Swiss-Prot record:
Name of the gene encoding the protein in the UniProt record: recX
Chief place of localization: cytoplasm
Domain of life, source organism: Bacteria
Keyword Secreted: no
Originating species: Pseudomonas putida (strain ATCC 47054 / DSM 6125 / CFBP 8728 / NCIMB 11950 / KT2440)
The protein's name in its UniProt record: Regulatory protein RecX
Length: 156
């Protein structure tokens, strides 16, 4: 049975339940509350209050999302795009990616090792295949080129 979200208390309770499961961005939390029947006039003040109390934090959400998606083998470009689609500000995303402690070259090498067993491409076709795979995963082309040609990635 779904509760009716027609009071600030009900909205706050539902928002806190969602935040207890995992971090959410403001846009995502607003969308979920709307789907449950809450009105914007009631949602906004409650989300403001949760943010003031430190229970709703875009910075924590960004950090959590970056850690999760990079751990799943995705690079910074793919993560940036996914966060933009979730309604977060590009400047905040870029700052969070810069401040993340993810070693992108190491992460890319791990993904490449798992997929291609560490076999560098022997012909243009296999090089194109490996390049497409890593680019789709969101890793920068210059980093991909360095990995596939066997050059040192420690500059990243």
């Amino acid at each position: 049975m779904s509760a009716v979200l027609d009071t600030p208390v009900a909205i706050r309770r539902t928002a806190m339940d969602l935040l207890a499961r995992r971090e959410h961005g403001r846009v995502e939390l607003t969308r979920k509350l709307r789907q449950r029947g809450a009105s914007d006039e009631l949602i906004e003040p409650e989300l403001d209050r949760l943010a003031e109390e430190g229970l709703l934090s875009e910075a924590r959400y960004l950090e959590s999302f970056i850690r999760y998606r990079s751990g799943s083998g995705y690079g910074p470009a793919r993560i940036r795009e996914e966060l933009c689609q979730r309604g977060l500000a590009r400047a905040d995303i870029d700052q969070a990616l810069r401040e993340s402690e993810v070693n992108w070259s190491e992460r890319m090498r791990d993904v490449w090792q798992r997929k291609f067993a560490g076999q560098r491409p022997q012909d243009p076709r296999s090089r194109a295949q490996q390049t497409r795979f890593l680019a789709y995963r969101g890793f920068p082309m210059d980093m991909i080129g360095r990995l596939l040609s066997g050059r040192d990635l420690d500059d990243y």
